[in-house]
Amino acid sequence: LPEIINWAINLKNDNEMSDGFKPLEGMTIGSIYEKPSTRTRVSFEVGVNKLGGQPLTLLSNDIQLGKSESVSDTAAVLSRYLDGITYRCFKHSDVKLLAENASVPVINALSDMHHPCQAAADLMAITENKNDLNGHISWVGDGNNVLHDLLLAGVILGHDVKYATPEGMEPNQEVVDRAIEIGKETGAKIIATNDPVEAVSDAGVIYTDIFVSMG
């Protein structure tokens, strides 16, 4: 992850490198959206295009996924036409099933459990603006998919993450336990509280979110 973020920052800031780097040339990347999307859809389409590929957007009403065709059948069919698939879905089990049955790479563009590309983009922004982060990353909001991957990505990069969630809206404990285990290797800590004031005290970065998911 650190290498990907540093590479992305260099690509963003080096116009000559960006103009000449076309690893997706001749490839078509399909993006399936069960949920409406603004930033995710635009960023994937622009990104694939800039890297030389052809983006193909498939909305839920455009295909038979989950209707007359199963996720596994859809994965097999799309793999014959596409060089990669991104999938923004409701159930995390569906993106796992798609990945298991596809013969091309599959990227989770959002599920109810994870939002990895969002976390990578957030950590990239933090690295760009606070490379010498003095203090922990603070989260105030519900324990949703974005927090799950902020916990994982934050400790991978060696940052302590302290989060405040309302009682009964805590993150998935398996994800928290996984982040704690990763933190033991990187020296980063996960700290939980229900008090937002405590969470933001002495923070280097404060990340807030709504209590009702936008999807």
Residue map of PLM features:
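Short, acidic/turn-prone active-site loops that include or flank metal/cofactor-
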Residues: 61-63, 110-115, 166-169
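Short glycine-rich, flexible loops that bind phosphorylated cofactors or substrates
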Residues: 93-94, 213-215
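Glycine-rich phosphate/diphosphate-binding loop of Rossmann-like nucleotide-binding domains
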Residues: 34-46, 129-208, 214
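Active-site cofactor/substrate anionic-group-binding motifs, chiefly glycine-
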Residues: 28-81
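A short, aliphatic-rich alpha-helical micro-motif
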Residues: 79, 99, 199-201
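Anion-binding alpha/beta catalytic cores of soluble intermediary-metabolism enzymes, centered on
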Residues: 75-76, 83-153
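Positively charged, low-complexity intrinsically disordered leader regions
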Residues: 1-42, 46, 114
